[in-house]
Amino acid sequence: RSSDLYVVKREINFHIPFGEQAITYSPKSFAGSRHVIRARLALPEEIAARRNLAFNCYDEHGDTGFYPHASANVETRGEAVFAARNAIDGIFENSAHGEYPYQSWGINRDPGAALTLDFGREVLLDELRITERADFPHDNYWVKATVEFSDGSTLDIPLVKSAKPQRVTFEPKRVRSLVLKDLIQAEGTSPFPALTQIEAFGTEVK
């Protein structure tokens, strides 16, 4: 798989996951004895294209030196299958939860949970898409979320019970980061809403 990355350091590292950290990747990802990793500079037309600026299947915890990067103030039990990075890995399978391909961002039942998406530079956003985990009846779902942008503006997003991406568009905003917060879950018996993917569509600042 490939992602468009914004690199701010002269050197970047991707740490090969082992054990519990590996179960959010395909079991075939690091199998066998031959592997290839390849990187190249993006073409001008690729840089100029409107795209999902949140997608990064190589994201990890900590200061990676490349963007986009997802982090959160809470992740369920600190487990890899519920880490913030799962919400930008480009995998939309959401009819179950746990190991690949059903990883998600889990909020550990915390009403104050918030996810930060850092683009590493200013970008021009005009659309967000939220895909909630939909492992019903195990899961609950959110009926409202708030996004706070780095320019100080906020956006309330109404949500419904759905396995599909839920889309909201707005006038282009020049931002470096955003925070998904104030997650209001539906009334019900399940205390387990979760996020499968957040997408942020837009372009580079010209």
Model-derived regions: residue spans:
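Aromatic, loop-rich ligand-recognition surfaces of beta-strand-rich domains
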Residues: 1-4, 92-155, 159, 164, ...
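Long, low-complexity intrinsically disordered regions enriched in Ser/Thr, Asp/Glu, Pro/Gly
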Residues: 1-18
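Disordered, acidic Ser/Thr/Pro-rich linker "stalks" and the adjacent N-terminal cap
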Residues: 13-114, 118, 137-140
